[in-house]
């Protein structure tokens, strides 16, 4: 909602750029934490976690000084009851749920997938699995923010959804572990547009949704992010 409230001409690009830093931040955390654990030993993980905790604290202090423009000042705010009665809103919720499930299912299992498929250590699995997934996801979002693509966000979402399905099939059915790992990376690239794309679509199609709409969308994404990996774990554990 902060990006959608910014008085900027190309909010789709800004949304993708903002989400790309989440991906690059994940890569940085994995690399720096791995290096720190190598140097200082595994018993230093509490100190490392405490140091990383300073980042959200700094963000909180920073945003406490940032003036935030309200979207509803222009369009007016829609009542929550009316929002919940809109079929379009429920379609956006399902898209957000699917985006979270597709993204986090592969992200959470990429490390274990690399370990078991390639027979490497957990450290190498994190670097090959999580870092490659997050890096390609960040690249997709960064390219979306910088390249002047005339294709609509709706067409991009459909194309990325098809690529995501193909990457999951490649990861599951590839005859060689290296090809399966490539599927993990392609999945990261394909899901890069989905999460920020749903936010942009919601702000464009329902500008009067207000903060409540984005809160519900975030909730749907979080449920998908937690439910997707859990379901995969249950299915994998039963076979």
Protein language model annotation of sequence segments:
Residues 86-138:
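Extracytoplasmic gate region of multi-pass secondary transporters
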Residues 207-239:
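A late C-terminal transmembrane helix in Major Facilitator Superfamily
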Residues 68-92:
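Juxtamembrane intracellular "pre-TM" segments in multi-pass secondary transporters
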């Amino acid at each position: 909602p902060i990006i959608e409230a910014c008085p900027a001409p190309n909010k789709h690009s800004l949304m993708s750029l903002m989400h790309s830093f989440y991906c690059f931040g994940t890569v940085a955390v994995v690399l720096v934490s791995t290096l720190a654990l190598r140097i200082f030993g595994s018993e230093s993980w509490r100190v490392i976690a405490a140091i990383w905790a300073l980042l959200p604290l700094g963000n909180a202090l920073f945003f406490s000084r940032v003036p935030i423009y309200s979207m509803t000042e222009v369009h007016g705010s829609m009542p929550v009851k009316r929002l919940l009665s809109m079929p379009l809103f429920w379609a956006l919720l399902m898209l957000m749920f699917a985006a979270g499930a597709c993204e986090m299912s592969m992200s959470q299992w990429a490390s274990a997938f690399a370990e078991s498929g390639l027979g490497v250590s957990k450290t190498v699995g994190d670097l090959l699995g999580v870092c490659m997934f997050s890096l390609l996801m960040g690249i997709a979002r960064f390219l979306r923010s910088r390249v002047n693509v005339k294709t609509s966000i709706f067409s991009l979402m459909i194309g990325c959804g098809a690529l995501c399905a193909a990457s999951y099939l490649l990861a599951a059915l590839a005859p060689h572990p290296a090809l399966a790992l490539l599927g993990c990376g392609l999945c990261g690239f394909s899901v890069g547009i989905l999460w920020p794309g749903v936010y942009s679509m919601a702000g464009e199609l329902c500008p009067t949704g207000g903060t409540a709409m984005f809160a519900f969308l975030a909730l749907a994404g979080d449920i998908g992010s937690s439910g997707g990996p859990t379901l995969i774990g249950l299915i994998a554990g039963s076979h």
